[in-house]
């Protein structure tokens, strides 16, 4: 699951490694750009039809079905609701930029209802490719 798909930049990288990517983008402008990128054949993905409230309230989507969740863009808080609703053994990767984590890529691994947090690296656009190459990342 990719949250905040934007133009589809990271989606296009991930689509090289997975045949099935579900994406969430709630900005109407970005949704149209994302759809245009799919139509141009830049990547293959499924854009889920959700509002931001439906997503965060876990109404139309069951986060538990995903084992790998990537959140694009910087968060100023840890994604507590997503972690809480994720299934055991789910991995959640995001960038957090606040006073505790200055623009860090953070990975959460949920085990037996608890979440383990790992600070991976400084956030940079080339990092996702390095991460996908070095980690067993199956969607």
Question: What positions do the PLM features span?
Answer:
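Conserved nucleotide-cofactor-binding alpha/beta core module
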Residues: 1-111
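Active-site capping/gating segments
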Residues: 97-139
């Amino acid at each position: 699951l990719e949250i905040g798909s934007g133009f589809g930049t990271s989606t296009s990288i991930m689509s090289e490694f997975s045949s099935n990517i579900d994406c969430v983008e709630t900005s109407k402008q970005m949704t149209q750009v994302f759809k245009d990128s799919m139509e141009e054949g830049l990547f293959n993905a499924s854009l889920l039809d959700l509002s931001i409230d439906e997503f965060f309230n876990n109404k139309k989507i069951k986060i538990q079905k995903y084992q790998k969740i990537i959140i694009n863009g910087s968060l100023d808080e840890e994604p507590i609701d997503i972690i809480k609703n994720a299934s055991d053994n789910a991995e959640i990767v995001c960038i957090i930029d606040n006073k505790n984590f200055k623009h860090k890529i953070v990975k959460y691994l949920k085990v037996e209802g608890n979440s383990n947090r790992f600070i991976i690296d400084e956030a940079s656009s080339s990092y996702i490719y390095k991460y996908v190459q070095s980690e067993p990342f199956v969607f």
